């Protein structure tokens, strides 16, 4: 990319809301204040969102957990998907180049629908997006088929607020497999339903595009996640139908799913904790490579309101680069960013001494 374009994007990057310290109230959040330009804020600079900050007052009820209730439909469908994806791997050498490029592009766009869309925009409100970008992200999110934005954001806010408890939908204390995919194969813990149902989701209920997606999600996901990626290679450049189905659809979808799941599993079990050694989330560079920038997870749980979800800008963080490009085009704005001073203070106060990001 030409240097002058990178300089323009970098300049757009600097036009952010600077958070000089975390908001009050929580294990992750001290009692300091914010700075936006020359103004000081005594509360979160995201007035529309409060329910993604850790709640240290919540504790699991004593006693044995309820018996797992398997959802056999999900188990069978996930097994079939991954069998199809494994077969797709064997077909990759026989695929046309256009099919491989198309599948990769579909993977990246789908991933952005989760990372830049469901996660950083709608779950945490770390930046704002104009209608064309929101429309792109809602389509990309539908391509990813990981539940609609409303449900994804509700589960993710519960994950942050009640992290590592039974009210956390993918509680990593229940093991790698459960936090990776097992939580999707069983009925939700009663605490997840109870606490998740009480979260304030009024910001998303008021967003017509999010609720439109939720209303028409099933036909939308069938078209965008399965029909379109299968038919385009087959119809447009003569790929075999089996290659299109197993590589462009099954393999691509399985890779996107597992890249996202690794944030919940591997990034809570393996890696450094330079920002907060008291929480399980970690900096995992391999996860960040697969999940287009979401692997700096210790930072993200320490500072969930930072739009970059990382201390280091574009370092193995394509999602931040994408958002900054959108800002250059005027489609993204009001990006929240934690100041260097606040980050260093947090490292000194609660870090594990590794002083490494990823």
Swiss-Prot record:
InterPro entries membership: Acyl-CoA_DS, FA_desaturase_dom, FADS-1_CS
Induction remark: Up-regulated by agonists that activate NR1H3. Slightly down-regulated by a high-carbohydrate diet enriched in unsaturated fatty acids.
Residues given in the record as Fe cation 1 binding sites: 119, 124, 156, 160, 300
Region (Disordered): 16-39
Domain of life: Eukaryota
Pfam families found in the cross-reference section: FA_desaturase (PF00487)
Cytoplasmic side: 1-71, 118-216, 263-358
Record GO terms (molecular function): metal ion binding; palmitoyl-CoA 9-desaturase activity; stearoyl-CoA 9-desaturase activity
The enzyme's E.C. designation: 1.14.19.1
First-tier enzyme category under EC: oxidoreductase
Cofactor note: Expected to bind 2 Fe(2+) ions per subunit.
Reaction catalysed by this enzyme: octadecanoyl-CoA + 2 Fe(II)-[cytochrome b5] + O2 + 2 H(+) = (9Z)-octadecenoyl-CoA + 2 Fe(III)-[cytochrome b5] + 2 H2O; hexadecanoyl-CoA + 2 Fe(II)-[cytochrome b5] + O2 + 2 H(+) = (9Z)-hexadecenoyl-CoA + 2 Fe(III)-[cytochrome b5] + 2 H2O
Parts of the chain on the Lumenal side: 93-96, 237-240
Keyword Membrane in record: yes
Localization per Swiss-Prot or TrEMBL: Endoplasmic reticulum membrane; Microsome membrane
DNA-binding as UniProt keyword: no
Binding-site list for substrate: 74, 147, 154-155, 187-188, 261
Function per UniProt: Stearoyl-CoA desaturase that utilizes O(2) and electrons from reduced cytochrome b5 to introduce the first double bond into saturated fatty acyl-CoA substrates. Catalyzes the insertion of a cis double bond at the delta-9 position into fatty acyl-CoA substrates including palmitoyl-CoA and stearoyl-CoA. Gives rise to a mixture of 16:1 and 18:1 unsaturated fatty acids. Contributes to the biosynthesis of membrane phospholipids, cholesterol esters and triglycerides, especially during embryonic development and in neonates. Important for normal permeability barrier function of the skin in neonates.
Family (UniProt): Belongs to the fatty acid desaturase type 1 family.
Protein name per Swiss-Prot or TrEMBL: Stearoyl-CoA desaturase 2
Species, as recorded: Mus musculus (Mouse)
Gene transcribed to yield this protein: Scd2
């Amino acid at each position: 990319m030409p240097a002058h374009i990178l300089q323009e994007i970098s300049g757009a990057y600097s036009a952010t809301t600077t958070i000089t310290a975390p908001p009050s109230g929580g294990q992750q959040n001290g009692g300091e204040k914010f700075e936006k330009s020359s103004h000081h804020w005594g509360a979160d600079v995201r007035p529309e969102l409060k329910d993604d900050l850790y709640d240290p007052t919540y504790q699991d009820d004593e006693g044995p957990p309820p018996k797992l209730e398997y959802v056999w439909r999900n188990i069978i469908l996930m097994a079939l998907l991954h069998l199809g994806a494994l077969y797709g791997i064997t077909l990759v050498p026989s695929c046309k180049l256009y099919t491989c490029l198309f599948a990769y592009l579909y993977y990246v766009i789908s991933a952005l629908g989760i990372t830049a869309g469901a996660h950083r925009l709608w779950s945490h409100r770390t930046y704002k997006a104009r209608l064309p970008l929101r429309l792109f992200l809602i389509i990309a999110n539908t391509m990813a088929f990981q539940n609609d934005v409303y449900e994804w954001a509700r589960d993710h806010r519960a994950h942050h607020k009640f992290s590592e408890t039974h009210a956390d939908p993918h509680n990593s204390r229940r093991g790698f497999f459960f936090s990776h995919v097992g939580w999707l194969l069983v009925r939700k813990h009663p605490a997840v339903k109870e606490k998740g149902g009480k979260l304030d989701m009024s910001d998303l209920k008021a967003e017509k595009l999010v609720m439109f997606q939720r209303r028409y999600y099933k036909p939308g996901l069938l078209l965008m996640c399965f029909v379109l990626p299968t038919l385009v290679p087959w119809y447009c450049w003569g790929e075999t139908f089996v290659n299109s189905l197993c590589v462009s659809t099954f393999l691509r979808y399985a890779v996107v799913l597992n890249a996202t799941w690794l944030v919940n599993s591997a990034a809570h079990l393996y890696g450094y904790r330079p920002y907060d050694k008291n929480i399980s989330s970690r900096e995992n560079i391999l996860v960040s490579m697969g999940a287009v920038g979401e692997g700096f997870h210790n930072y993200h749980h320490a500072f969930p309101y930072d739009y970059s979800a990382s201390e280091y800008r574009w370092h193995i963080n394509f999602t931040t680069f994408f958002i900054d490009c959108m800002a250059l085009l005027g489609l993204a704005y009001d990006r929240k960013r934690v100041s260097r001073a606040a980050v260093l203070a947090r490292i000194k106060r609660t870090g594990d001494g590794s002083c490494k990001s990823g």
